[in-house]
Amino acid sequence: MNSKGQYPTQPTYPVQPPGNPVYPQTLHLPQAPPYTDAPPAYSELYRPSFVHPGAATVPTMSAAFPGASLYLPMAQSVAVGPLGSTIPMAYYPVGPIYPPGSTVLVEGGYDAGARFGAGATAGNIPPPPPGCPPNAAQLAVMQGANVLVTQRKGNFFMGGSDGGYTIW
């Protein structure tokens, strides 16, 4: 059937004699100290009482003249409360992200096909699911800011999430 013959055989690798391994089999590390108390409760981690009331205020704009900047000046530092043993070191106390009364724009956040259940109104932003961090709109509402949400773009060819149909 095959006039060329068989394929050449590959040489086998020589057997290595067992010897001392390059790395030690066990590595002795110091044991971590045991926990002395339970971790803090969820409500203790997210208390806004660690920020001084004056630290989270927004500087007011003075009467601007033509050509002046329309942006608010950045605060140089935020004064925080004394760090004690009650605050876990993994969490840093900070002020609100959105100043109260400000308006936050969330582009493409409104989905025309989304339904929020019975009794939902147009001004209702649902809370985040358990175990999930809040999105920008939910954070702004929690901190007293206004939220403006624009509709997600969709067309006949790109589709949408409103349960439409496809013609093949």
Swiss-Prot record:
Biased composition (Low complexity): 1-13
Chief site of localization: cytoplasm
Region (Disordered): 1-25
Motif (PPAY): 39-42
MF GO annotations: DNA-binding transcription factor binding; identical protein binding; mitogen-activated protein kinase kinase kinase binding; p53 binding; protein serine/threonine kinase activator activity; protein serine/threonine kinase binding; receptor tyrosine kinase binding; ubiquitin protein ligase binding
Modification after translation, per record: Ubiquitinated. Ubiquitinated by SMURF2, leading to proteasomal degradation. Ubiquitinated by NEDD4, leading to proteasomal degradation.
Residue ranges the record marks as coiled coil: none
One Gene Ontology cellular component: nuclear body
Residues bearing the modification Phosphoserine: S77
Signal peptide (residue range): none
Tissue/organ expression: Widely expressed. Expressed in spleen, thymus, prostate, testis, ovary, small intestine, colon and leukocytes. Down-regulated in multiple myeloma.
Keyword field: Cytoplasm, Nucleus, Phosphoprotein, Ubl conjugation
Location in the cell: Cytoplasm; Nucleus; Nucleus speckle; Nucleus, Nuclear body
Induction comment from the UniProt entry of this chain: Induced by cellular stress.
Pfam families (UniProt xref): DAZAP2
A GO biological-process term: positive regulation of RNA polymerase II regulatory region sequence-specific DNA binding
Effect of S77A: Loss of phosphorylation by HIPK2
Consequence of substituting K4A: Does not affect ubiquitin-mediated degradation. Abolishes nuclear localization with the protein located in the cytoplasm
Record keyword tRNA-binding present: no
Function: In unstressed cells, promotes SIAH1-mediated polyubiquitination and degradation of the serine/threonine-protein kinase HIPK2, probably by acting as a loading factor that potentiates complex formation between HIPK2 and ubiquitin ligase SIAH1. In response to DNA damage, localizes to the nucleus following phosphorylation by HIPK2 and modulates the expression of a subset of TP53/p53 target genes by binding to TP53 at target gene promoters. This limits the expression of a number of cell death-mediating TP53 target genes, reducing DNA damage-induced cell death.
Binding partners and assembly: Interacts with SOX6. Interacts with DAZ1 and DAZL. Interacts with IL17RB. May interact with FAM168B. Interacts with INCA1. Interacts with EIF4G1 and EIF4G2. Interacts (via PPAY motif) with NEDD4 (via WW domains). Interacts with transcription factor TCF7L2/TCF4; the interaction results in localization of DAZAP2 to the nucleus. Interacts with transcription factors TCF7 and TCF7L1. Interacts with transcription factor LEF1.
Name by which UniProt lists this protein: DAZ-associated protein 2
